[in-house]
Amino acid sequence: MINMDISVTPNYSYIFDFENDFIHQRTRKWMLENWTWVFYYCGIYMLVIFGGQHFMQNRPRFQLRGPLIIWNTLLAMFSIMGAARTAPELIHVLRHYGLFHSVCVPSYIEQDRVCGFWTWLFVLSKLPELGDTIFIVLRKQPLIFLHWYHHITVLIYSWFSYTEYTSSARWFIVMNYCVHSVMYSYYALKAARFNPPRFISMIITSLQLAQMIIGCAINVWANGFLKTHGTSSCHISQRNINLSIAMYSSYFVLFARFFYKAYLAPGGHKSRRMAASLAAQNVVKQSSSPQQASESSKFIGAGEDQAAYLRKAKAQ
């Protein structure tokens, strides 16, 4: 028998057994007992990616087009499913209980087993998502600061917030699932050599910027609610708010900087053309023979991949 508080739970048309069997107390206990693991994961991640760059320095790049298609497709499917199972809870709470409940009451974990299960998977998914960087290293694409900084901070913050049952995290989870649904679908198509319209990449970056703005706004509301009602009514810590707003603000600055350079800078080219042109020029300058010069077309493709990656540099 399904044991959920119907008053704060949307009317799911179907609930899977693995969702109904979810017990949030067990997962929280495990996260609390193993909270130090996240720092080991981050340390190993840094060693692998920067060590991998050194390893690949004098080796030819891998194409990995097939694995990349599968990788992006799986992440897109996971994100779509996650959005479909968590967004109804947020909408239901906003409609029937208002903004305060959506920011201050963690019913999405404590009373809703469906949303609680997909919240747990969301946190766990930040570990395999580190694999994005493996493709960058093996394909010898630029590893920009935003990429690895984002991966590490999201993993640590997600783990930390889950142990606290941070109530405002329902917003962050739904937004991340939704944006990743579009983003990974787009990159799966790009990896498969389909060519979605150019404006799609601009829309994705705009969605990422909107995600950061909303994230900052939610934290401002949470801070106000916390000061007005206290921790007894608003289940979020001041430390969490401070960390979250610092994280979202830094993401916004980094994404806004890219957006300006890619789409708005006077006299600038689109990011793909810039990367392809620079790659081609670099090869021509370094080539001293016709055979070497003929390799420029391969580097142009690498430049296009670089630009595609820069647009992907994620949010979380």
UniProtKB/Swiss-Prot annotation:
EC top class, as a word: transferase
GO molecular function terms listed in the Swiss-Prot or TrEMBL record: fatty acid elongase activity
Keywords for the protein's UniProt record, in alphabetical order: Endoplasmic reticulum, Fatty acid biosynthesis, Fatty acid metabolism, Glycoprotein, Lipid biosynthesis, Lipid metabolism, Membrane, Mitochondrion, Mitochondrion outer membrane, Transferase, Transmembrane, Transmembrane helix
Name of protein: Very long chain fatty acid elongase 6
Null allele phenotype: RNAi-mediated knockdown in larvae confers resistance to tunicamycin. RNAi-mediated knockdown reduces ER stress response caused by the accumulation of unfolded protein in the ER by reducing Ire1 and PEK/PERK signaling. RNAi-mediated knockdown in imaginal disks results in lethality. RNAi-mediated knockdown in cyst cells results in abnormal sperm cell development with abnormal organization of individualization cones.
Phylogenetic classification of the source organism: Eukaryota, Metazoa, Ecdysozoa, Arthropoda, Hexapoda
Pathway note: Lipid metabolism; fatty acid biosynthesis
Annotated membrane topology: Multi-pass membrane protein
InterPro entries reported in the protein's UniProt record: ELO_CS, ELO_fam
A single BP term in Gene Ontology: sphingolipid biosynthetic process
Source organism (scientific name): Drosophila melanogaster
PANTHER family tied to this protein: ELONGATION OF VERY LONG CHAIN FATTY ACIDS PROTEIN 6, FATTY ACID ACYL TRANSFERASE-RELATED
Family: Belongs to the ELO family. ELOVL6 subfamily.
Pfam families attached to this UniProt entry: ELO (PF01151)
A GO-annotated cellular component: endoplasmic reticulum membrane
Compartmental location: Mitochondrion outer membrane; Endoplasmic reticulum membrane
Top-level taxonomic group: Eukaryota
Enzyme Commission no: 2.3.1.199
Glycan-carrying positions: N11, N242
Tissue: Detected in the CNS (central nervous system) of third larval instar (at protein level). Expressed in cyst progenitor cells (at protein level). In the adult fly, expressed in several tissues including, sperm, follicular epithelium, nurse cells and cyst cells.
Transmembrane segments: 30-50, 64-84, 117-137, 142-162, 167-189, 202-222, 245-265
Function in brief: Catalyzes the first and rate-limiting reaction of the four reactions that constitute the long-chain fatty acids elongation cycle. This process allows the addition of 2 carbons to the chain of long- and very long-chain fatty acids (VLCFAs) per cycle. Condensing enzyme that elongates fatty acids with 12, 14 and 16 carbons with higher activity toward C16:0 acyl-CoAs. Catalyzes the synthesis of unsaturated C16 long chain fatty acids and, to a lesser extent, C18:0 and those with low desaturation degree.
Catalysis: reaction(s): a very-long-chain acyl-CoA + malonyl-CoA + H(+) = a very-long-chain 3-oxoacyl-CoA + CO2 + CoA; hexadecanoyl-CoA + malonyl-CoA + H(+) = 3-oxooctadecanoyl-CoA + CO2 + CoA
